């Protein structure tokens, strides 16, 4: 007979005798990853108690943080939304405010919002091998509060919420206008009739350009080099047809799978036939822009498709803004800032009232939380990642990170289900700790994110390591991971035990 979590071992999976502030699971973050984890963990382990610690004052995570004009999904909303809660709006590329509303409604529908402690910034987590529990320290209203839990799930993403990346631009202090980073967009910034320069060519920059152009006098996207852009319809015909023929949830799952397959096929085609994909994207740009437009200078990257993340432009909105004369792209290098704007190395000058530094993110593992084992601090970047969601020799800790080439939620949901599955397995055997162990066999290292984006290359030393063979190989392949999950050998390279069965772990 399989025991339920609370029946597994007397006192090990319930709050009896554990004292105030104890729960079975602490989830860090109330965005996509945290909400998914809460749903999946309790779906499979309904008796487990949990608390979500969210540093912001609202649900949404990234989708509450980013408030810049035009913020939206950069992949299909049907793969970004949860498989268990259908996306019901018509658009397949969703605005940030609607994603935030969807997350809030989902958390409320399943009672997840009742478990959230807002304004709780997790600073540290220390594992105690004498009791097989984590002590999690959170900052709330300037004071520190401690929680204890058997398990910790980090759904806090992969980048620094406090500050984005801005290069040291020469003379930036002399600029007389306003400098804004999209990660901290001022609510009261009025850009109507202003001249705006957006520095960057990534997803944020290409989202900002057409949106700002609706009200600004002139918007210029200044890039050092081009990025591949792919245009897709904001309102998909497949979703509309599926909703007419199928019940709501079935339609959602069908469109979700269709979107995941098309994204995977296009990625594979980009890898296998880069010249063909490059030609297709170039033809789209030529057909969408005015005759004679210098497509090769501004929209022909030097690298192959998907060597860096490709940027989505719904209904070719960026090309349309350029064609309408409301926006432009300049490919050049910055020499220095001056009072009136940006002097270029080519000798040109971009006048500006507002400069937006869409120059990237700063990555960090586990939300910047200090992790220690029996009081000995560890560095996550020294550890290999196990099945993309646990750290080598770190017990009862899970970390959710999405794909670089597909929607975040595809891996987030696999991670949440794998976590729930492991917790159920542990409960059935009465285990109180589990950790992946590589042993002494040498392992070839590789970056856990195999993409050449600047924000990744700048921060390789901030992320855990990937190996080159399972289960330590971090892949960017949803379907391979989904198959692995289905046939998962849950005890592969894992050490299980009960409280006080082993010596304390060293860092």
Predicted regions and their residues:
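Rossmann-like dinucleotide-binding core of oxidoreductases
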Residues: 15-22, 26-28, 32, 37-49, ...
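Core beta-strand elements of the Rossmann-like FAD/NAD(P) dinucleotide-binding domain
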Residues: 23, 142-151, 191-192, 345-354
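Glycine/threonine-rich phosphate-binding loop and adjacent beta-strand/alpha-helix elements that clamp
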Residues: 358-426
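Feature captures the FAD/FMN-dependent oxidoreductase FAD-binding
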Residues: 91-160, 336
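C-terminal active-site-capping segments
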Residues: 413, 417-507
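Short beta-strand to alpha-helix junction loop
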Residues: 87-105, 117, 199, 269-278, ...
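Beta1-alpha1 glycine-rich phosphate/pyrophosphate-binding loop at the start
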Residues: 23-27, 32-116, 223-224, 288-293
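Glycine-/small-residue-rich beta->alpha transition segments that form the dinucleotide
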Residues: 127, 149-162, 183-185, 202-203, ...
């Amino acid at each position: 007979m399989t025991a339920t979590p609370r029946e597994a071992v007397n006192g090990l999976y319930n709050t009896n005798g554990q004292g105030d502030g104890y729960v079975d699971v602490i989830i860090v973050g109330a965005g996509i990853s945290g909400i998914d984890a809460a749903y999946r963990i309790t779906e499979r382990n309904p008796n487990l108690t949990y608390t979500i610690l969210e540093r912001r004052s609202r649900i949404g995570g990234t989708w509450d943080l980013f408030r810049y004009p035009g913020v939206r999904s950069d992949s299909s909303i049907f793969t970004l939304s949860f498989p268990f809660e259908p996306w019901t709006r018509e658009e397949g590329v969703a605005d940030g405010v609607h994603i935030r509303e969807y997350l809030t409604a989902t958390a409320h529908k399943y009672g997840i919002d009742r478990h959230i402690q807002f304004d709780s910034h997790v600073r540290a987590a220390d594992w105690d091998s004498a009791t097989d529990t984590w002590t999690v320290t959170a900052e709330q209203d300037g004071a520190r509060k401690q929680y204890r839990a058997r398990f910790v799930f980090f759904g806090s993403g992969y980048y620094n919420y406090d500050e984005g990346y801005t290069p040291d631009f020469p003379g930036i202090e002399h600029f007389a206008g306003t400098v804004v980073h999209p990660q901290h967009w001022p609510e009261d910034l009025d850009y109507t009739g202003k001249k705006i320069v957006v520095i960057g060519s990534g997803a944020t920059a290409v989202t900002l350009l057409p949106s700002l152009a609706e009200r600004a006098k002139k918007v210029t996207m200044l890039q050092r080099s081009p990025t591949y852009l792919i245009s897709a319809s904001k309102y998909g015909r497949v979703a509309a047809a599926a909703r007419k023929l199928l019940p709501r949830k079935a339609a959602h799952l069908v469109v979700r799978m269709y979107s995941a397959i098309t994204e995977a096929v296009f990625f594979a085609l980009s890898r296998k036939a880069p010249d063909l994909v490059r030609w297709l994207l170039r033809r789209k740009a030529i057909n969408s822009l005015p005759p004679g437009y210098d497509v090769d200078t501004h929209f022909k990257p030097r690298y192959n498709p998907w060597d860096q993340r490709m940027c989505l432009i719904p209904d070719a909105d960026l090309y349309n803004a350029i064609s309408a004369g409301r926006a432009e792209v300049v490919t050049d290098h910055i020499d220095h800032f001056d009072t009136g704007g940006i002097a270029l190395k080519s000798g040109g000058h971009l006048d500006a009232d507002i400069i937006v530094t869409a120059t990237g993110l700063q990555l960090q593992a586990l939300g910047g939380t200090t992790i220690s084992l029996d009081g000995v601090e560890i560095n996550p970047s020294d550890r290999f990642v196990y099945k993309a969601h646990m750290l080598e020799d770190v017990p009862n800790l899970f970390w959710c990170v999405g794909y670089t080439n597909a929607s975040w939620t595809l891996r987030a949901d696999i991670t949440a289900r794998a976590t729930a599955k492991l917790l159920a397995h542990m409960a059935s055997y009465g285990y109180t700790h589990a950790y992946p162990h590589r042993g002494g066999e040498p392992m070839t290292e590789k970056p856990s994110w195999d993409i050449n984006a600047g924000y990744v290359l700048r921060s390789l030393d901030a992320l855990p390591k990937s190996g080159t063979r399972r289960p330590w190989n971090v892949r960017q392949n949803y379907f391979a991971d989904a198959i692995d999950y289905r046939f998962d050998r849950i005890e592969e390279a894992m050490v299980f035990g009960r409280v006080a069965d082993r010596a304390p772990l060293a860092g």
